[in-house]
Amino acid sequence: MTDPVRFDPLSLDLPFMDEAHEQFMQLLAIVDEADDLHLAAAWRDLVEYTAQGFACEDRWMNDTGYAARRDHQIQHRVVLEVMRDGITQAAEGRLLHVRQMAWQLRDWYHKHVQTMDAALALHLRGKRFDPANGGSGPRRSSVAAARA
């Protein structure tokens, strides 16, 4: 008997992007599970990780000449600005607002990955882009990476 095929709506079959998406969802789950005392710190961790992840994607788009980068980067900026506002909301004790933001963020993120990031992943695969190599070019195999 064969194992059933599993569908992961956040998988783009590009390991470095898939790992980033998985980490984002893990941090978002921590926000969801955080009690009121720890919510602000969990949200701050999510915002910091997201800022770094968006910066990486923005750099990849610029470095590879991705045609749709402007719209993609605008989405990153707008969402990150709203997320940063959540830090202020948490500091002011509006924790329910932060929890609602987390709930809405999950929905947006799934759509963003399935549309914007899926198109970017297709572009990066076409360019044979690998951030471990510092950009475009042949991907380093795990054997070659281990020897380096």
Residue positions per predicted region:
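Small-residue-biased structural context
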Residues: 1-148
